[in-house]
C-alpha cells in the first residue's frame, strides 16, 4: 500500500458524492462573455466587479512599469524589494481609505493570516462572526488568542459575548467581513462599532467584497456607513474590484510599521512585480475618476436580483452583487451549475465545506461590464434549467 493511497481514496469519495470539480480553463480575459474550455459563455462567477481586469489603461500601466523597473522585484520588501511604485501604491491606498498608512500583502488571504497574530496573542480574545472568511479563521487560529464566535450578524449575541468577556483578557478584537462572500449580506457595522467602543475593543473589517462596491468611489463598507476613523483595521483586496492581485491593510501608522517587522507573510515573501503594483495604482485612480462604474454595477445587481426572485429562486439575504441561488441539496446544486454551463452560463456551484450542509447553492456575481442582454440571456437559462430540475 502506497503512503499516498489515502489521497486517491479521498478523491474517489468526492467523485462518488458528485462533489469533485475539475479546474476549468479560462481561455480569454475576464469579461462578461468569456471563453471557458473552448466555449463562449456568460461569466457570472468572476470577482471582477468593475470590469477593470481587462481595462487597456491597466495593461498599459503594467507594461510601462515593467519596462521601467523590470519583470520582478527580486527581493522581499524588508531587504531591497520595496520599489518606488510600491510606496506610491500604498500612499494612494491610505489616502483612498482615509487612514494614516497602508501596506500591501501578496494576497488578501495572507493579510488576515499575517495581521491578526500581530494584534492579538495568548491572553487576548478574538470575537468573530461565525460566517467570517476562511482566511480570518486561519488568522485567528495562528494568533493563539482565545476565539469567541457570535451568531452571524446577531448583535444581541455579540453583546452577550462582550459582556461575558469584559475584564477577562488583555486585549479584545472584534472581526467581521464587510460583505459576506457566500451570502452577499452586509455586516451591521454601526452596531458593531458602537458595541466595540462601549466595551473597549479593537475592530477589524475585511472589506474584500466591499472594496469597489460600497462607499464613495468604492471605498468600502466602513466609508459606506460613515465610520471613517472609528474602525481600527481595514483589510482590502486588489484582486476583485481592483482587478489585479494582492491585498492590503489600512490603519494606524504604528500598526503598518509593526507589520513591516512582525507580519510574517510580508516579511518572508517577495514583493509584487512592479507591473502589478502599477496596474493596481491605475485602477484606484480610475475608481476615483469614474464613479459611474459603480452605478452600473448596482443597476445590474438590482435588475438581476429582482428577476431571479420573480422566477421563484431563493436568493437568501443578499444585499450586494453577490447573489446566491440557494438550492440546499449538494448534488442538485452541482447539477444546476453543470446544466447552466451547457446552456452557456458559467455560475459556480458551492457546497460543503465552503457553506454549511443543506445550504448548497450556485453563487452568481454580476459586474458593471455586463449588458442587459447578457443578464436576460442568463436569466432565461436559469428559468429553463430551474424548471427542469424542479427548483421553481
Swiss-Prot record:
The keyword Transferase applies. Substrate binds at residues 21, 133, 354. Its EC number is 2.3.1.47. It holds the Pfam family Aminotran_1_2. The keyword Transferase applies. Pathway: Cofactor biosynthesis; biotin biosynthesis. Pyridoxal 5'-phosphate binds at residues 108-109, 181, 206-209, 237-240. It comes from the Bacteria. CDD domains: KBL_like. NCBIfam families: bioF, gly_Cac_T_rel, PRK06939.1. Belongs to the class-II pyridoxal-phosphate-dependent aminotransferase family. BioF subfamily. This is 8-amino-7-oxononanoate synthase. It comes from Symbiobacterium thermophilum (strain DSM 24528 / JCM 14929 / IAM 14863 / T).
Amino acid at each position: 500500500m502506497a503512503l499516498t493511497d489515502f489521497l486517491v481514496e479521498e478523491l474517489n469519495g468526492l467523485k462518488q458524492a458528485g462533489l469533485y470539480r475539475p479546474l476549468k480553463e479560462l481561455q480569454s480575459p475576464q469579461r462578461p462573455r468569456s471563453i471557458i474550455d473552448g466555449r463562449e459563455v456568460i461569466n457570472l462567477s468572476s470577482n471582477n466587479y468593475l470590469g477593470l481586469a481587462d481595462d487597456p489603461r491597466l495593461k498599459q500601466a503594467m507594461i510601462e512599469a515593467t519596462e521601467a523597473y523590470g519583470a520582478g522585484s527580486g527581493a522581499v520588501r524588508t531587504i531591497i524589494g520595496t520599489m518606488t511604485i510600491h510606496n506610491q501604491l500604498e500612499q494612494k491606498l491610505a489616502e483612498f481609505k482615509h487612514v494614516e498608512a497602508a501596506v500591501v500583502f501578496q494576497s488578501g488571504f495572507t493579510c488576515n493570516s499575517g495581521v491578526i497574530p500581530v494584534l492579538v496573542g495568548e491572553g487576548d480574545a478574538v470575537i468573530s462572526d461565525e460566517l467570517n472568511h476562511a482566511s480570518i479563521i486561519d488568522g485567528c487560529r495562528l494568533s493563539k488568542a482565545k476565539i469567541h464566535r457570535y451568531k452571524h450578524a446577531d448583535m444581541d449575541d455579540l453583546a452577550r459575548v462582550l459582556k461575558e468577556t469584559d475584564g477577562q483578557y488583555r486585549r479584545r478584537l472584534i472581526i467581521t467581513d464587510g460583505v459576506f462572500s457566500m451570502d452577499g449580506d452586509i455586516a451591521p457595522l454601526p452596531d458593531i462599532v458602537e458595541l466595540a467602543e462601549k466595551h473597549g475593543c479593537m475592530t477589524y473589517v475585511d472589506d474584500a467584497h466591499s472594496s469597489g462596491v460600497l462607499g464613495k468611489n468604492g471605498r468600502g463598507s466602513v466609508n459606506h456607513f460613515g465610520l471613517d476613523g472609528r474602525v481600527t483595521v481595514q483589510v482590502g483586496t486588489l484582486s476583485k474590484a481592483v482587478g489585479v492581485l494582492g491585498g492590503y491593510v489600512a490603519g494606524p501608522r504604528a500598526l503598518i510599521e509593526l507589520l513591516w517587522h512582525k507580519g510574517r507573510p510580508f516579511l518572508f515573501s517577495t514583493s509584487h512585480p512592479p507591473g502589478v503594483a502599477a496596474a493596481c495604482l491605475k485602477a484606484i485612480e480610475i475608481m476615483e475618476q469614474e464613479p459611474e462604474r459603480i452605478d452600473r454595477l448596482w443597476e445590474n445587481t438590482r435588475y438581476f436580483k429582482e428577476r431571479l426572485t420573480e422566477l421563484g429562486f431563493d436568493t437568501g439575504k443578499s444585499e450586494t452583487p453577490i447573489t446566491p441561488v440557494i438550492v440546499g441539496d449538494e448534488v442538485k446544486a452541482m447539477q444546476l451549475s453543470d446544466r447552466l454551463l451547457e446552456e452557456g452560463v458559467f455560475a459556480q456551484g458551492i457546497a460543503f465545506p465552503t457553506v454549511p450542509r443543506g445550504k448548497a447553492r450556485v453563487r452568481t456575481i454580476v459586474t458593471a461590464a455586463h449588458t442587459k442582454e447578457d443578464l436576460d440571456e442568463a436569466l432565461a437559462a436559469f428559468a429553463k434549467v430551474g424548471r427542469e430540475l424542479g427548483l421553481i
